[in-house]
Amino acid sequence: MGGYSMADLWAILVMQGFSGLSLFSVLMLMALGLAIIFGQMGVINMAHGEFMTIGAYAIYVCSKVASTYLPALLPYYFVFAIAIAFVVAFGVGYAVEYLLIRHLYRRPLDTLLATWGLSLIMQQVFRSVFGAREVSATLPNWLMGAWKPTPTIDIPLNGLFVMLVSVLVTLAVVLFLYRSNWGLRVRATTQNRVMARAVGINTSRTDRITFALGCGIAGIAGAAFTTIASTGPTSGSLYIVDTFLVVVFGGTASLMGTLASAFSIAQAQSILTFFMTNAMGKVTTLLTIIVILMLRPEGLFTAKVRR
């Protein structure tokens, strides 16, 4: 096939598959946050990508501080910087929900327009603070290089790290939603807001924490993003369409659907863009998803919701 031997073709497919897993990990983190905000709360957050950018810039600032003032901590700073990225994105998300989103519940068109305007404002703030050019964080040495399971296959260590972060965050979110009192409040508010309020749940505070949590997870996605690409003011907006596709295709209130959808879309794009052009690969993936959604509008998985 195209001058490739079977061994070469196998190595290419494995590396493209792993590249798809790296994309899957970032998409998964982005989609997890959006699934909580959009799926659990019904809020269309067009600024979700900018919260990813906040996390990425938080990593960049931490790398500058570590390399300039604390060089001895440079090999270890990245783990702490991920936590900082989460806290910063969480805090900004909390403020946005309190100042803007809470006034727009049950007004989806107004929410869409308001968050779209917010995304443009945030992008301009990024340009004013960090400049229009893309920046890169200084990565620790243990994130550099590749693992070679065979002489013809190279698997980047940063991709393995991104996958590990994605798995840990996914497990943490599942435990939070299904094994904690706060997760019980979130699910109760989603299923029946009036009844949840009647039994004493502060639904306004639950909404605020839920929205902030989704933004914080997007911040972690931004932290993971810095290991595989440079960061610019519009980096997050490049992922927002794919992220909405993941959530809608998987089922808006299903975490399992989000997992399956992110994996399917990432692998399809990674493999198709190798055999086609980048644009054709994405178009083919999008058209396939549209056809499937025409046949199954509720997505891959559905969740029972009481009204």
Which residue ranges define each predicted feature?
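Single transmembrane alpha-helix segments in multi-pass membrane proteins
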Residues: V14-C62, A95, L99-L109, R127, ...
